[in-house]
Amino acid sequence: MLVHLFRVGIRGGPFPGRLLPPLRFQTFSAVRYSDGYRSSSLFWAVAHLRSQLWAHLPRAPLAPRWSPSAWCWVGGALLGPMVLSKHPHLCLVALCEAEEATPASSTPHVVGSRFNWKLFWQFLRPHLLVLGVAVVLALGAALVNVQIPLLLGQLVEIVAKYTRDHVGSFMTESQNLSTHLLILYGVQGLLTFGYLVLLSHVGERMAVDMRRALFSSLLRQDIAFFDANKTGQLVSRLTTDVQEFKSSFKLVISQGLRSCTQVAGCLVSLSMLSTRLTLLLMLATPALMGVGTLMGSGLRKLSRQCQEQIARAMGVADEALGNVRTVRAFAMEQREEERYGAELEACRCRAEELGRGIALSQGLSNIAFNCMVLGTLFIGGSLVAGQQLTGGDLMSFLVASQTVQRSMANLSVLFGQVVRGLSAGARVFEYMALNPCIPLSGGCCVPKEQLRGSVTFQNVCFSYPCRPGFEVLKDFTLTLPPGKIVALVGQSGGGKTTVASLLERFYDPTAGVVMLDGRDLRTLDPSWLRGQVVGFISQEPVLFGTTIMENIRFGKLEASDEEVYAAAREANAHEFITSFPEGYNTIVGERGTTLSGGQKQRLAIARALIKQPTVLILDEATSALDAESERVVQEALDRASAGRTVLVIAHRLSTVRGAHRIVVMADGRVWEAGTHEELLKKGGLYAELIRRQALDAPRTAAPLPKKPEGPRNHQHKS
């Protein structure tokens, strides 16, 4: 019965559009379970475990029998039913691959939170040698610890053998045994030190590799992915979840493997000392297995909910701290504190509920173990009285059973950490396994000298993935001639910024095609398109908290200092940059908060121009500036637009009068198009927008304050 094991079959790998596969339970022996198999209480418990897990997992066709990703061995001869009775979730480690979660609606490639053993193996494989040494040392420390109860029993026999009158004989006979014990204690300490150091080495390196891979995966996701997920939740995956998984991984080896080995070894020793007492201890196994399985299922669900709530709280904090100036401007500190407090309160409730469950599990196990010790003393004392067991053997049995109890207690503490770690690891691997719809690279590149810059939108329809039922663009058709300026105007919500997003291929149209020089954008390399062809300048440019030099060079990493200076001059930025004490090495602060709006905008223009784009997108580039800053920035934009295909998005119609073509958008379509004069003569929507802005201008313009008059000199008549 000690070598009776579970083998859990899971088919690995995501299958879009399919349910996750079921489990198959087999024994290490030739016995195979069927639904009606009930030959013993242990087999009944195994079948009950199977039914419980089957109810919580989805189903699909079975995997090939010997597929390397299909079978995960949990246990060996060292993991008998006694171990699984206390720590059934060591079996469930393999089951978390089939854990079902709700997929994100806006990311079609998400298949749910499931532990990806294939990815885990990729991170573990480079460290297998070091990990193998750590495992050997941990097993050695555990086996040394198994020998100690037997030697203590022999020492007790020597103590009982001699009286006070034979102290010399006692010291002589116990010297070798005591020396042996001291050596074992020293070896155990050295082995423990060795495997803990090696585990720390493996765990930290794996954590770094996982964070790097997760960050790389997140950066490669579609813009739609970030539309649907908060930044704080993603940062939580990089920090909290990876840390949780790393801790669980190290604990499974340092405590789990060692404790399981000690339990198995001590059980073998116990059976050699007294088969009757050992069998009595094994009677509690099936009941503990069933209770542990039921409680583990509920605790796993609570752990997942707790982690999701923590991620939501972090999202609220990240949003408030990232927009602290807006919060301060509206005096909304109290409201943000209340929002964050509400999320923390929900976290507390979930965590306390999880803690109560873990405490209940540990409390019940302690009661069971204490009853087992009491029963051992009672029955063992009877055997000693009947001369069926010596006092030394009973002492060895008690110490060995205490070792089992202590190991089980460690597993009980480890239980909650493993549950949390597996949930965290499943979520980390879930994001690593995501495949973006629009890859970062792949496709053809057009030589720079062959690019003309002609852009065509042909019968384009588009809905944002997070709002699939709302169509933003409807049969939209537009051509941007090479070297010309085309302006998009219209009321808010008409789809102007969406056109720019499609041109940068942040999204793909749901219908129709976007072409560059007659080539479908979907056939071109996205990184080449964004990195060398299209330059983008938005209304509120985002700068990084580094130097001005590095912010401009962000548009072209290999650019020389002279290229940076030239781009700054072209953007009318060189003069104000050199006025700073540190010049181009000036730190701009987080998101460029130390610069004015006009200064940030000119740096953004320089960043876009340094890569010499063929197509330039100006999305409300001057709408947030004052008159003087707008004049300086507009001069830079006029120089930047020369010889390039330019798409201008504007609300202030006065800024687009010089465009070669003005396109008025309404309801996701081209309403009318022409030059400024042509559209005014037509008297359509554009003329109406001009008239409205002319009427609104006097009301929105703030009158200049009058210059205060100085004191008058009054002449008094005499």
UniProtKB/Swiss-Prot annotation:
One GO-annotated biological process of the protein: potassium ion transmembrane transport
Regarding the membrane, this protein is recorded as: Multi-pass membrane protein
Keyword annotations: ATP-binding, Ion transport, Membrane, Mitochondrion, Mitochondrion inner membrane, Nucleotide-binding, Potassium, Potassium transport, Transit peptide, Transmembrane, Transmembrane helix, Transport
Q: Where does ATP bind?
A: 490-497
Regulation acting on activity, per entry? Channel activity inhibited by ATP via ABCB8/MITOSUR subunit.
Q: Which Gene3D superfamilies match?
A: ABC transporter type 1, transmembrane domain (1.20.1560.10), P-loop containing nucleotide triphosphate hydrolases (3.40.50.300)
Give the UniProt subcellular location, in the record's own words. Answer: Mitochondrion inner membrane
Q: Region (Disordered): which ranges? A: 697-718
Parts of the chain that traverse the membrane = 128-148, 179-199, 279-299
InterPro entries xrefs = AAA+_ATPase (IPR003593), ABC1_TM_dom (IPR011527), ABC1_TM_sf (IPR036640), ABC_transporter-like_ATP-bd (IPR003439), ABC_transporter-like_CS (IPR017871), P-loop_NTPase (IPR027417), Type_1_exporter (IPR039421)
- State the Pfam families in the record: ABC_membrane, ABC_tran
Query: Which GO terms of the molecular function aspect are on file?
Result: ABC-type oligopeptide transporter activity; ATP binding; ATP hydrolysis activity
Q: Where is the transit peptide?
A: 1-25
Chief location: mitochondrion
Tell me yes or no: is Mitochondrion among this UniProt entry's keywords.
yes
Domain ABC transporter: from-to ranges: 455-692
Residues of the ABC transmembrane type-1 domain: 133-420
Give the UniProt entry's GO cellular component terms: mitochondrial ATP-gated potassium channel complex; mitochondrial inner membrane; mitochondrion
This chain's function reads: ATP-binding subunit of the mitochondrial ATP-gated potassium channel (mitoK(ATP)). Together with pore-forming subunit CCDC51/MITOK of the mitoK(ATP) channel, mediates ATP-dependent potassium currents across the mitochondrial inner membrane. An increase in ATP intracellular levels closes the channel, inhibiting K(+) transport, whereas a decrease in ATP levels enhances K(+) uptake in the mitochondrial matrix. Plays a role in mitochondrial iron transport.
Q: So what family is this one in?
A: Belongs to the ABC transporter superfamily. ABCB family. Multidrug resistance exporter (TC 3.A.1.201) subfamily.
Q: How does it assemble?
A: The mitochondrial potassium channel (mitoK(ATP)) is composed of 4 subunits of CCDC51/MITOK and 4 subunits of ABCB8/MITOSUR. Physically interacts with PAAT. Interacts with Neuropilin-1 (NRP1) in mitochondria.
Q: What name does UniProt use for this protein?
A: Mitochondrial potassium channel ATP-binding subunit
Q: Which organism is it from?
A: Pongo abelii (Sumatran orangutan)
